[in-house]
Amino acid sequence: MSKYTILDKINTPSDLKLIPESQLKILSAELRAFLVDTLDVSGGHFASSLGATELTVALHYVYNAPDDNIVWDVGHQTYIHKILTGRKDKLVTIKKDGGISGFPKRSESEYDTFGVGHSSTSISAALGMAIADRLQGKSSNTVAVIGDGAITGGMAFEALNHAGGIKEDILVILNDNEMSISDNVGGLSAHFSKIISGGFYNSIREKGKEVLKNIPPIFEFVKKVETQTKGMFVPANFFEDLGFYYVGPIDGHDVTELVKTLRILKDHKGPKLLHVITKKGKGYTKAESDPIKFHHVAPSFHSGENITTKISKPTYSNIFGDWICQKAAKDKRLVGITPAMKEGSDLIRFSQLYPHRYFDVAIAEQHAVTFAGGLACQGLKPVVAIYSTFLQRAYDQVIHDIALQNLDVLYAVDRAGLVGADGATHDGSFDLAFMRCIPNHVIMTPSDENEAYHMLEFGYEYNGPAMVRYPRGAGIGAEITGSLDLELGKAKIVKQGSKIAILNFGTLLPLAKQLAEKYHATVIDMRFVKPLDEIMLDKVSQTYEIILTLEENCIAGGAGSAVNEYFVAKDLSNKIIVRNFGLQDKFLNHGTKDLLLAQSKLCVENISQELDKLI
């Protein structure tokens, strides 16, 4: 007999609506158990979905998706949503090749109204949907679900301001679990904490509800008193000042109260915000105690089966974490900045050693970059630790605020290239292309851990903006040496051959060496995308018949394109054969990194097929 007596009856939201409301609490417990059992096999984002279980059940119980629009922010919390919308049996395939995505994806399900992976986009998208439906005469409801971490992003404020200003009929649900991936920071987060701890304020609201129940004729009077009460005990309610009808905070794990509240709000027209308090990791004791550790889990996290202990190589993030701590000890001008990715960027130790020189600016990439510029103007040396995919969000600031003024800012760009299971929303496919065209920048692509360490040092000491890009995960185990012969814009010949030259940019150097063994080719570690080693390119063009470029970045506009541009400018394009190998002009699905590299033709077999045609 199945232990999922209620869940077994549910494949779609229509099935969910047939379940008596009195059984929703039991269903929520079954959903958590199912999530634990499934992710123990597959792995995946865990704690966020546990925290949003009752909220997800209530939303699909009250609203009529997909006719009603439910828009999720970031997507870490949507595994329960996937279970309730026809993907229960596929959850075990999540983030696997050919399986379902770890994030909402429009091409995957009609219930995934908006594709997501980055933060703070939900309110903007939901507002667009609400207006579009209204203009087309549809009577649908639109809900945006956003966390207390994501709502600190500036884009969320812009959307709130717009929605409140035009009085659009939209519900924003603030899922306040006091815990995004890294601890929330900033004034708004502190404001939420004050609300949560304000027992007197909550008791006032509960008494107000009783008054409303028992004396309906004085509804408007009580509403006015409640507004005044909030003004007395809570600093001016931010959301009501923006034009939203604010409700809450309420218990986000009381599914009965959630259903009741959502039904009321469904009939209340105009912009409204429901503030729910949840606990990330709810129902799984270890995740409740350490939600950061259980934000994402590996297979066998629960059963403990097949878990082996092995000593792994340091990741590139670890190399950065070591470098910044060591450099900070020597240079008091160094300050470290991250947009809410302390753990992922390996800044934990730095934040502990140098708390007054560590700045987590929350999900605010634009602010992070310009803030760094301000620090640089006053003589400090800021290091911005940021993922490649999130650097995209601060492009204007990189150009206008840093490059134009030639300020000393070092970008430590993590997760450059393919990231694997998280898919296209998190791949760092474009940074070389969009950074290379900006004047005043130095761009470095280390081929191993030792180069990464010394390029960080070089970029820090460089007078002007510099960028070092490095991939997710471990390197090849290269030892960090005391020094490295590193000169601005100079490449290094790794292996000497004939006829074929392979110009490698970054950590695909092992692939270049494999090809060199097969074709007796010369391998050159280019090291710098900007400036290019033009002397080396001149020698290569005079010596070799075939030139290959390798990079884990989009081909269009990337490092290989820079090489092409140089050869065209020198009128050499008709005298040599050049082939660029990098990421193709398409978005890749999730999968293992080796699989995605092969799909991008970045493997010995695919490159050999191309080379064999040319030889």
UniProtKB/Swiss-Prot annotation:
Free-text cofactor note: Binds 1 Mg(2+) ion per subunit.
UniProt GO molecular function: 1-deoxy-D-xylulose-5-phosphate synthase activity; magnesium ion binding; thiamine pyrophosphate binding
One GO term of the biological process aspect: isopentenyl diphosphate biosynthetic process, methylerythritol 4-phosphate pathway
Catalytic activity line of the entry: D-glyceraldehyde 3-phosphate + pyruvate + H(+) = 1-deoxy-D-xylulose 5-phosphate + CO2
Residue sites binding thiamine diphosphate per the record: 76, 117-119, 149-150, 177, 284, 365
Keywords: Isoprene biosynthesis, Magnesium, Metal-binding, Thiamine biosynthesis, Thiamine pyrophosphate, Transferase
PROSITE patterns for this protein: TRANSKETOLASE_1, TRANSKETOLASE_2
CC terms in the record's Gene Ontology section: cytosol
EC number: 2.2.1.7
Pathway: Metabolic intermediate biosynthesis; 1-deoxy-D-xylulose 5-phosphate biosynthesis; 1-deoxy-D-xylulose 5-phosphate from D-glyceraldehyde 3-phosphate and pyruvate: step 1/1
Lipoprotein among keywords: no
Cofactors: Mg(2+); thiamine diphosphate
Residues reported in the UniProt entry to bind Mg(2+): 148, 177
First-level EC class: transferase
General function of this protein: Catalyzes the acyloin condensation reaction between C atoms 2 and 3 of pyruvate and glyceraldehyde 3-phosphate to yield 1-deoxy-D-xylulose-5-phosphate (DXP).
Subunit structure: Homodimer.
Family designation: Belongs to the transketolase family. DXPS subfamily.
This protein's name: 1-deoxy-D-xylulose-5-phosphate synthase
Source organism of the structure: Francisella tularensis subsp. mediasiatica (strain FSC147)
Designated gene of the protein: dxs
